[in-house]
């Protein structure tokens, strides 16, 4: 996984003629309740993200399926749109890479309507997680 992902990142950097900044978690805000973990960020200047990168390194049969469809698999749309929301960018590149097959590189545009509908679901999920953490913390304190 990680070795192939490094190869994919290098391929992308050459194909797009850009530097790819590796990073860990990126937080939506200082509260740090919502984050994403991009496989790379493309910066116009330090701290000025212009695009993100999501890399998938599927098995050969899955890569062939992706290539034949020529589209981003629907299961990755929430991840890509959510990452654009968190990083506040208008595009995110999806790269599906297998070392023995043609890469699939698609630029996904930000969908503000999708993000608007996603925010309440995300906030509800985060609230439920926080409630669960609080309950566990109180149980441990009581024990």
Enumerate the predicted regions with their spans:
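Accessory terminal regions of nucleic-acid processing enzymes
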Residues: 1-143
């Amino acid at each position: 996984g990680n070795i192939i992902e490094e190869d994919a990142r290098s391929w992308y950097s050459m194909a797009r003629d850009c530097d790819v900044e590796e990073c860990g978690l990126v937080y939506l805000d200082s509260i740090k309740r919502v984050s994403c973990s991009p496989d790379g960020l493309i910066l116009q200047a330090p701290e000025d993200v212009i695009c993100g990168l999501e890399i998938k390194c599927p098995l050969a049969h899955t890569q062939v399926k992706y290539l034949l469809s020529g589209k981003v698999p629907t299961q990755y749309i929430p991840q890509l749109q959510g990452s654009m929301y968190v990083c506040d960018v208008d595009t995110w590149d999806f790269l599906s890479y297998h070392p023995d097959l043609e890469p699939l590189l698609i630029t996904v545009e930000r969908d503000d309507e999708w993000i608007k509908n996603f925010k309440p679901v995300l906030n509800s999920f985060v609230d439920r997680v926080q409630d669960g953490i609080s309950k566990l913390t109180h149980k441990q304190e009581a024990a």
